[in-house]
Amino acid sequence: MDEILLQDPEIAKAIALESQRQMGKLELIASENIVSTAVREAQGSVLTNKYAEGYPGKRYYGGCEYVDMVETLAQERAKLLFDAQYVNVQPHSGSQANMAAYLAVLKPGDTILGMDLSHGGHLTHGSPVNFSGRLFKIISYGVQRETGRIDYDDVAAKAREHKPSVIVAGASAYPRAIDFARFRAIADEVGAKLVVDMAHIAGLVAAGLHQSPVPHAHITTTTTHKTLRGPRGGMILSTEDMGKTLNSQIFPGIQGGPLMHVIAAKAVALGEALHPAFKVYQQQVLDNAATLAACLTEAGYDLVSGGTDNHLMLVDLTSRDITGKDAEIALDTAGITVNKNTVPFETRSPFVTSGIRLGTAALTTRGMKQEHMRTVGQFIIAALEKRNDTAELEKIRKNVEEFAHQFPLFAHLA
């Protein structure tokens, strides 16, 4: 920070304030995590200076021998971690990984069967405001009203009726395990390709704590942050026979030069995920999520599907007449960072919502365990109950800050 402080004190100030925010607040946004110092060093390295259009051994620029080493290491580590034949580590984001996957097997106007955004899906699974909904015909499936779980019979019925070219499995706000084998059986029955977006659960999959989609999907996409705990970016996994097509969809299809400094950071994070400590961490993420979910349930809060199988939970605030927006604001005032989220069969706008989404990956990285989750749960409950009392929220914030500062941003669990 010394050079930034001297050269650009305004940016230095913003970075310092963000650092203080991360250390002094409780990060419960399910799509966020905290990377290691090694990952940050790789992303801030001299690799940011290098242009490297193409792929290892087939670049359009000279001087790529060392970035070839970096990208090859990232590919090989991902193949080993997920038992995949083919990996592309160049996507700048999960959304671009999904776009490349679709373009590899679809033509504009083809039909996609994907999870409804308000039921837990992602923008790229067919939202009309996203490229997926603008380029392709979208049929949506969702969860059962009674259980909050994916209605596989409905998925199968819609697949038979609409004969989609692609079925998308995976979600951004679904707290239960997904049966990828069942999705593949449905896809095979109607002659569809199965694309799985495992962005949220990639770390759990890598640790063997969630069914892997890789043996079942024709194409698997993911982000490299979230539970995988790497830099912000994307990745594609598939079989070797899909490799040439997928490579061409990323470059020259939708991207130019890869971000080699980010790919280096991906490689470091993938290396970390190959260590036994990573499985310990992921198990703690699950244990913490289960504890936090139980704490909220015991206090009378409604959780979509009644609980969680993974790192996240969705709190339905409808019965308490609290909007997700108001809950997010109150919790942030109290030093707890969450995001408002639609719930299945939502009646409010996505800018207001009836729920909040909570995740335990970041707090687990800081070294928190089940007993700490009970404390976090009590902070959440107190802040929601006192949401209209500014003075009480300030008292809670001070307690939250004191509690948060007991934990480093990145704790080594083993």
UniProtKB/Swiss-Prot annotation:
CDD domains: SHMT (cd00378). One of its GO terms (biological process) is glycine biosynthetic process from serine. It is found in: Cytoplasm. InterPro entries: PyrdxlP-dep_Trfase, PyrdxlP-dep_Trfase_major, PyrdxlP-dep_Trfase_small, Ser_HO-MeTrfase, Ser_HO-MeTrfase-like, Ser_HO-MeTrfase_PLP_BS, SHMT-like_dom. Pfam families: SHMT. The modification N6-(pyridoxal phosphate)lysine is found at residue 226. Keywords: Amino-acid biosynthesis, Cytoplasm, One-carbon metabolism, Pyridoxal phosphate, Transferase. It catalyses: (6R)-5,10-methylene-5,6,7,8-tetrahydrofolate + glycine + H2O = (6S)-5,6,7,8-tetrahydrofolate + L-serine. The keyword Cytoplasm applies. It comes from the Bacteria. Gene3D superfamilies: Aspartate Aminotransferase, domain 1, Type I PLP-dependent aspartate aminotransferase-like (Major domain). Pathway: One-carbon metabolism; tetrahydrofolate interconversion; Amino-acid biosynthesis; glycine biosynthesis; glycine from L-serine: step 1/1. GO terms for molecular function: glycine hydroxymethyltransferase activity; pyridoxal phosphate binding. Its cofactor is pyridoxal 5'-phosphate. Its main location: cytoplasm. SUPFAM superfamilies: PLP-dependent transferases. It is an enzyme of class 2 (transferase). Its EC number is 2.1.2.1. (6S)-5,6,7,8-tetrahydrofolate binds at residues 117, 121-123, 349-351. NCBIfam families: PRK00011.1. Catalyzes the reversible interconversion of serine and glycine with tetrahydrofolate (THF) serving as the one-carbon carrier. This reaction serves as the major source of one-carbon groups required for the biosynthesis of purines, thymidylate, methionine, and other important biomolecules. Also exhibits THF-independent aldolase activity toward beta-hydroxyamino acids, producing glycine and aldehydes, via a retro-aldol mechanism. Belongs to the SHMT family. Homodimer. This is Serine hydroxymethyltransferase. The gene is glyA.
